[in-house]
């Protein structure tokens, strides 16, 4: 893991941060965590021991994470990957989407996006995009809306994510557009 990109700080997205300590503690290297100012502050408040060393901490303890502020509209570079940070409306809050090397988009926990975000995502090779459930929701995209977004973006391939408990794989797969499939645990893909 070279870095973490935080879309937002709802518990289903950040509660596992503590589990990453095991990967970084032995080598005492810091994992960069990229988040908006507000979401970064929330994470540091919830998990202070991941970012700050207390005076009474053992001498061998090195906080495993470093918070780095990002904002929608910004571009950052992690290794050889250029990442465009995208604004998303998540109902009563905002979330971030990401576009990697101009060919892979990631949009979850989103109910609306500005036109310029759709323009940035146009014709990507792969778009992982939220489709919570069949009926509309105040902060998440539903199946029909996501299908309309896919038609607008025209990705080579779309994978639905953040599926709700009532989303049945076979039923959803049967109504997906030709280039679209529901995501599954363990999904692996390669981009050139």
Where are these regions (language model features)?
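Binuclear metal-dependent hydrolase catalytic cores
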Residues: 1-107, 173-192
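Ser/Thr-centric signal marking residues that sit
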Residues: 7, 107-108, 129, 161
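Binuclear metal-ion centers of metallo-dependent hydrolases, dominated by the metallo-beta-lactamase
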Residues: 114-126, 131-192
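Short beta->alpha connector loops
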Residues: 88-92, 110-113, 164-166
């Amino acid at each position: 893991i070279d870095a973490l990109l935080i879309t937002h700080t709802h518990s289903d997205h950040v509660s596992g941060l503590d589990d990453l300590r095991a990967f970084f503690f032995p080598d005492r290297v810091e994992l960069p965590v990229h988040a908006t100012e507000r979401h970064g502050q929330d994470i540091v408040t919830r998990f202070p021991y991941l970012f700050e060393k207390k005076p009474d901490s053992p001498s061998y303890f090195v906080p495993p994470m470093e918070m780095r502020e990002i904002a929608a509209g910004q571009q950052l570079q992690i290794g050889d990957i250029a990442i465009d940070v995208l604004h998303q409306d998540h109902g009563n809050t905002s979330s971030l989407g990401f576009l990697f090397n101009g060919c892979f988009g990631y949009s979850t926990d989103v109910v609306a996006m500005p036109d310029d975000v759709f323009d940035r995502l146009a014709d990507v090779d792969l778009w992982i995009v939220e489709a919570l459930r069949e009926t509309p929701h105040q902060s998440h995209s539903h199946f029909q809306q996501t299908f309309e977004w896919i038609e607008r973006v025209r990705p080579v391939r779309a994978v639905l994510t953040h599926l709700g408990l009532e989303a049945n794989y076979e039923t959803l797969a049967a109504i997906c557009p030709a280039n679209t499939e529901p995501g599954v645990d363990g999904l692996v893909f390669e981009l050139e």
